[in-house]
Design a protein with these regions (language model features):
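ATP-dependent carboxylate activation and anion-phosphoryl transfer catalytic cores
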Residues: 1-121
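Active-site proximal loops enriched in glycine and acidic residues that flank catalytic Cys/His/Asp
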Residues: 1-5, 16-19, 72-74, 101-102, ...
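Short acidic, glycine/serine/threonine-rich loops at helix termini
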Residues: 10-16, 26-29, 53-54, 82, ...
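Conserved active-site and cofactor/substrate-binding residues in soluble primary-metabolism enzymes
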Residues: 31, 35, 39, 92, ...
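Short, solvent-exposed amphipathic alpha-helical segments in soluble enzyme
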Residues: 31, 112-115, 139-146, 167, ...
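Catalytic domains of riboflavin
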Residues: 56, 77-79, 84, 88-95, ...
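Conserved structured catalytic cores and adjacent interaction surfaces
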Residues: 120-192, 196-204
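Peripheral docking tails and interdomain loops at the edges
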Residues: 172-173, 178-263
Length: 263
């Protein structure tokens, strides 16, 4: 709530009521073609859904699109050399983009392109993850090898990957001597970085060099396993994507909804 008033006898005015979905609702509306904010506002004003027939001459219906939509944040880190791009609870994004595709991987790839991240079609990926993520890292490494990428990892991560029978090279952390990850990134030998760390101040400080080296050399990086897994799915579509218009997708949805019998 945003409230304004002065003095003990002041009239208090409620200037704003924010439902904390101010950016998610427009995204879902754009993904489905449904004016959710308008529908919700009319419900709050007392108008039942059945009476809201302004959309295609029918009452609002649940929409389950046959495609995927992904919202991705845009960050300004490349404008601030030397800053650690690891994310925390504070707001750091300066905008958002949306990727739409017939598969999750295609939508993910489009969202990354829109946000300014370039995913390689070939090359070497470095993986260094915390212990809790090693099992998931094995699957990611296996998928990368199947896609034709070379995989290198720090000692502990490499051991977990190798134990699963996935080919992997070993690269040093900075504290273990040269050549280390930052050296390979600066030399152009790494095209993609997957790195996760324990959420402790020391672990974050120790791994800062990986993130800053990737940022300084414009190497795309991911700092969560969810991000790494999604990016790996996107790499499966790196050879080409199909451009689609939201208008055409929404029209197809409307055709399907028009054929849906009333409840």
């Amino acid at each position: 709530f945003a409230i304004q008033g002065e003095g003990s006898e002041a009239v208090v005015y409620v200037l704003e009521v924010n439902p904390r979905a101010s950016r998610t609702v427009p995204f879902v509306s754009k993904a489905t073609g449904q004016p959710l904010a308008k529908i919700a506002a009319r419900c709050m004003a007392g108008q039942k859904l059945a009476a809201q027939t302004g959309i295609g001459g029918r009452a609002p219906l649940e929409v389950v699109p046959p495609y995927f939509s992904i919202k991705e944040a845009v960050f300004p880190f490349n404008k601030f050399p030397g800053v650690d791009p690891i994310l925390g609870p504070e707001m750091r994004s300066t905008g958002e983009v949306m990727g739409v595709g017939l598969s999750f991987g295609e939508a993910m790839l489009k969202s990354q392109l829109g946000a300014g991240s370039r995913l390689p079609a070939k090359g070497t990926v470095v993986i260094t993850v915390k212990n809790a993520d090693k099992a998931r890292a094995v699957k990611v490494a296996s998928d990368l090898v199947d896609l034709g990428f070379s995989v290198v990892a720090t000692k502990g991560t490499a051991a977990a990957i190798a134990a699963a029978g996935v080919p992997v090279g070993v690269v040093n952390k900075v504290k273990d001597g040269r050549p280390h990850i930052a050296d390979m990134v600066k030399a152009g030998e790494i095209q993609l970085v997957y790195t996760t760390v324990d959420e402790t101040r020391q672990a974050i400080a120790d791994s800062r060099y990986i993130r800053t080296a990737a940022l300084a050399n414009r190497v795309t990086y991911y700092t969560t396993m969810a991000g790494a897994e999604a990016a790996t799915e996107a790499l499966k579509h790196a050879e080409g994507i199909e451009v689609q218009s939201l208008q055409a997708l929404h029209a197809e949805l409307e055709e399907g909804l028009a054929a849906t019998p009333a409840a």
